[in-house]
Amino acid sequence: MPDSIPSLPDWLSRGMADLFPAGDPSDADQALAARLAQAEKEGRPLRVKLGIDPTGSNIHLGHSILFRKLRAFQDGGHTAVLIIGDFTARIGDPTGKSATRVQLSKEQVAANASTYLRQLGQDQPKETALLDFETPGRLEVRYNSEWLEGMDLPAVIGLLGTGTVGQMLAKDDFSKRYGSGTPIALHEFLYPLLQGYDSVAVNADVELGGTDQKFNVAMGRDLQRHFNKGTQFGLLLPILVGLDGVQKMSKSLGNVVGLEEDPLSMYSKLEKVGDAAIDDYVTLLTDLDLASLPDNPREKQKAMALAVTASRHGIEAAQKAQSDAATLVGGSGDAGADVPEASLAEVNFPAKAFYLFSAVGICASSSEARRQIKGGAARLEGEKITDPNQEFTSAAELEGKVLQLGKKTFRRLVA
């Protein structure tokens, strides 16, 4: 009988948006499955690359879907190669940018990299860490300055010779900027080549990336072929939409859930994710079986929020957050009518947080409101308010939301 056609394990294919090599997706699936089988036969783990440029200081759940897939490879017995782009971060990835990025200093990049590793779980037990830092042979942390900083001019010119201007202008971001007359600095053309060379340097078998990284991941394959290093597979994952359910999760859009948020804040935010986005959140952020979850969107939200919060803080903290959130906003919303209402009719907008608490009668004065907020007693929809000067623009922004002071004082805001 002929050999059965290999297929990808569920942990690998879950949430996958695209897989290189290009062409018939089933062919790519079978090719990667065959490479997995061959690696197992040889007793050799695959080397799975994920590169991150430490251009900021915080990781949110939108970033975490790539790290979750990298962790899945680790748990499957393979080697995660986490590349800290300490060199490329000084150039800045032009992907998705309409203008040249501001270049960062070595000191800024080093500080951000240290923060990233801490958030990924460098000092945490592997049960709640995004990556497994404990099991020998499961993780390599590499800095691309190792091989890029020492490149001499002939090597750089040689690298530039592997690409063309036409190839670079085919990249959507460059094409738009060129068409609109927005300047493109020459060093920006280097970025995809440098990121691609990372795959050569670490002998990657698989590279992970978001769907917005397709050009850069393909460049890695091209450079591996050029340097006779084999060819990596590119496994692309979707871009997670933010809490608004519309735009991608982004700190600048204010629709994020940070990895380091406290359990109650994390759970409360996730419990309000829009119906259209719930299935993606379940698939990309949890190991829950979507088919076994209730059809009721509200129950599905709660299951997802509990699972995500538990993955970061442990099940006991997550269950407590779920219980506390139910107390704050009446659980599923059915008991929400028991929360006293407070009118926004007399509130002058834009309104700062300290003024809002006093204007609706939760605090006796603005000074008391400032003190309570600074003391950590104030929340809106379960999310802690830490800045007394946080500004709210209109009554519509607050309509129907629950304002809380301490453990016993709640007001549902009505316009």
From Swiss-Prot:
Q: Which CDD domains is this protein grouped with?
A: TyrRS_core (cd00805)
**Cellular component, GO, one term:** cytosol
Q: What is its main location?
A: cytoplasm
Which GO molecular function entries does the Swiss-Prot or TrEMBL record give?
ATP binding; RNA binding; tyrosine-tRNA ligase activity
Motif 'HIGH' region covers 54-63
Mind listing the GO biological process terms from this record? tyrosyl-tRNA aminoacylation
Give the E.C. number(s). Answer: 6.1.1.1
Q: What's in the keyword line of the UniProt record? A: Aminoacyl-tRNA synthetase, ATP-binding, Cytoplasm, Ligase, Nucleotide-binding, Protein biosynthesis, RNA-binding
Q: Where is this motif: 'KMSKS' region?
A: 248-252
Q: Which domain of life is it from?
A: Bacteria
Q: Which residues form the S4 RNA-binding domain?
A: 351-414
Location in the cell reads: Cytoplasm
Q: Does the keyword ATP-binding apply?
A: yes
Annotated ATP binding sites: 251
User: Aminoacyl-tRNA synthetase as a keyword?
Assistant: yes
Reactions this protein catalyses: tRNA(Tyr) + L-tyrosine + ATP = L-tyrosyl-tRNA(Tyr) + AMP + diphosphate + H(+)
Which Pfam families does its entry note? SYY_C-terminal, tRNA-synt_1b
HAMAP family annotated for this entry? Answer: Tyr_tRNA_synth_type2
Q: Which family does it belong to?
A: Belongs to the class-I aminoacyl-tRNA synthetase family. TyrS type 2 subfamily.
Q: Tell me, what does this protein do in biology?
A: Catalyzes the attachment of tyrosine to tRNA(Tyr) in a two-step reaction: tyrosine is first activated by ATP to form Tyr-AMP and then transferred to the acceptor end of tRNA(Tyr).
The record's listing under PANTHER family reads:
TYROSINE--TRNA LIGASE, TYROSYL-TRNA SYNTHETASE
The entry describes its oligomerization and partners as: Homodimer.
Name by which UniProt lists this protein: Tyrosine--tRNA ligase
This protein's gene is called tyrS
